[in-house]
Amino acid sequence: MEVTKWMVHVCVFLVIGVVHSQIVTQTDLNNIADNLIVKVDVIRNYDNGNLHLIKVTFNNKASKSLSGYNWKIYFYSFFIVEPSHILSKDGLYTKPDGYTLPNVNLKLMHENGCLFSMSPTSEFIGLPHNEKREITFSAALWAISKTDFPPNWYMTANGLNARVISSTKGDFVGEFTSDKQWKRKKADKYDPYSPSVRYHRYKTTNSNVQQIVVIPTPKEITNKDHTKLLDVSGNVTIVHNGLDEEAKLITDKYNFDIGKTASTSGVNIYLFINNSISSSEGYTLSVNPSARCVTISGKTNTGVFYGVQSLLSLLSQGNNLQQMEIRDEPRYEFRGMYVDVSRNFVSKTVLEKLMDAMAMYKLNKLHLHLADDEGWRIEIQGLSELTQIGSKRCHSERDGICLIPQLGSGPDTSTSGSGFYSIQEYKDILSYAKKCHIEVIPEIDTPGHARAAIIAMEARYRKYKNTNVTKAVKYRLIDPNDTSKYLTNQLFNDNAVNPCIESTYVFIEKVVSELKAMHTDAGHPLNIYHFGGDEVAKTAWVNSTKCDQLNFNFSGDTASIRNELKNYFTQRVANITFTHGLNMAGWEDGFNAGDGMPFDISMYQNQHIYSNAWDNVWEWGEARRAYNYANAGYKVIMSHATHLYFDHPYEPDPEERGLYWATRCTDSYKTFGFQPDNLYQNIDVTVMGASISRAGICKSNTTCPLLHKPKNIAGMQGHLWSETILSEDNFYYMVFPRLLALAERAWHKASWENVIDETLQNSMRTRDWDNFAETVGKKELKRLDDIGIKYRVPPPGASNEGGEIKLNTVFPGLNIEFSKDNQIWKTGTIRDTASTVFLRTKSADGRRTSRVVQFNPATSTAWTIQLSFTTITLCSSILYICLLRH
């Protein structure tokens, strides 16, 4: 087969034959889209320190030549392609004419966001049947993971329906076999880990590993005696004193009786309210074999609910309960999980399973990111355009049909790029949350990250502008005369609502009032409205005529102008929420006045203003905001990206899903080791993996201010941004089992957190982790299996120890299988120490497996085709230069 290379910088190509016939029928387009084999390879990173080179191979297996010049191929990139040619010199916009690759006759264009296109010029040379060609082009920064290349590229031709290129639906990214591919720069210290390296990271020297009784660890356990057991396999009666829902939680899982009076012959479980307990979420649990009873008390129904969850955890180990007394209460009032359903949508069922797990592990806040640039996900009565248009991503030649494809969503609405919760579905979510004792916090991101709302309201404007101008402009979100140019971190040029027009606040008032009504109808009152506030482009609004009319006394640079307008916007939104009796929350940069300090909190009338402190990449110098905001009176939610962003990979491996702008990887151990009460103690490595210390970063109180008002640390939260979450399985994989480590730290303060000596603290933390990992592997993962959660199964470690191959996993108790041919799998001892072997870990229920890795006993440090990095080592912060999300 003849191969012709289209090279960006090389002016050599073979003319195979010029065919100028167009793609004229849908059959032609379908045939090419179904049979054009596309493969993407990273050639190298750190080209000139700022670029990576990409090779795209096209292999035409269609019966028709890919020729003519009336077609386009759309693809996705998190970074600007050919930035020196497509990006303006000031970086504020992309050139509308794109860039034609020299001597290739393909034009590259930035459409918007991460959507790009390539199209032939009139000089394009066709790609005949059964021919293969390659093009090479550059893109900004780096690509070190397969998920850096979203799937579902698609083709269009004039007047025809767009069609996904079938070969890009699945695995179309080549292997990463060189450090030039998986390192961002030469200074990058991260490599994928071999099974041998992983084995030594999993390995523990602790000879006294013990399972934790309950996760999260209770505050106090006394009178524990494993020789005194209470058998609950027979007649058991629950006496619940009006705590019907809490009693039902037990009977849903076990065939126990519910009675108004105690049984005289069997075992009794007593549930009751005890007002003497200090914490509203605190509880006591007593297992008394001699009295043949279990007693659970709480100050509130919520406290009893958590006591029941602890009992269910004990019962999962069998019918014999050890004698013990538990006195427990949470470390923080706010123990949250954030879910971005805008970038990629997840169903109500997925959220309900998530809440089941949150309840099991005593997490109590579900922060739902319902609107962003890529999608609007909640029905609002009277604003049908928000869901008719803003909830859909598709390819359309007409305005007002849908949002443009993003993040691999493809040309139609069949993928996770489209979807929304109806009013009834949202009420159902709220009702389920109430049952799980979880507060739902809705977020509508403004003033930035609002493209979905803007596009929807512009469609509404066009619909009514010729018949009812008042109705047309009522909810409009932009100033049509604003000529400001900007490009956001996510490459959008039109995503900021205008803070200087009254219709913006009419829109927000409408959304807040409708959300509040839904919460009230569901019996789940709205308490906190999250307005977003993050990542507003620096030059948004600088040329807005409407903002000029407000007569602000602007001074300084464009960032100062933006901050003044953000301040105005934030006050207006706070006033709206205050009139509805709500508290307000936002991302920390939404309140940022500059120099790490927030806007004056006295400007807000709300009882509480919550700030999510996320931006703690140590070298960036913004970790100080968390304590500065708390000292200024804000209620701070520790949301730090280096430890609590679950959209980041578990390991520094090209095979692992996720973004990596804040840290190359975040495994369960890293989240487990987070110290929210001692933020600067978490300082570990530079953006490229070199060790750093607190002393090196915290050279002054300006860089690392002290915390003077610790009571203003409201709690902590895990986060799943969904740029790479394309399925339900992706969702569970990224959240679990990291959520368990989050719950442990949010509920329980470990003794090692108070230890000043770093060596002693590390030793104590490792022992605590060993016990936690033992419990997760031998108990908790099976519980997750039982409720249908497909957590990540970690790949195994392996080591040739003096001729004996030893295997382990990060969570002890999971079975490991081996194979000589990657087809027939066995368990047991590996006898052959001379040949390469395939390895995989099984889930606790035995139904699923980890990624397959290869191990060469002869070298014991061989690199694998699917390498991994995991726990015990604190993987760390990585500069992705404000890529996609915080």
Where are these regions (language model features)?
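Acidic, contiguous N-terminal accessory segments
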Residues: F149-P330, M584-G596, Q605, G788-I789, ...
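Short beta-strand elements of extracellular/lumenal beta-sandwich folds
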Residues: V38-S65
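Active-site neighborhood of glycoside hydrolase catalytic domains
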Residues: T488, F492-H608, N616-G621
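C-terminal GPI-anchoring signal of eukaryotic secretory precursors
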Residues: N856-I872
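Short, compositionally stereotyped local motifs that mark structural "simplifiers"
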Residues: Q761-S860
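Feature activates predominantly on carbohydrate-active enzymes
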Residues: N288-F507, V512-H530, W721
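Intrinsically disordered, low-complexity Pro/Gly/Ser/Thr-rich segments with frequent PxxP/GP/PP motifs
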Residues: K89-I144
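Flexible, acidic glycine-rich loops studded with aromatic residues
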Residues: N583-G803
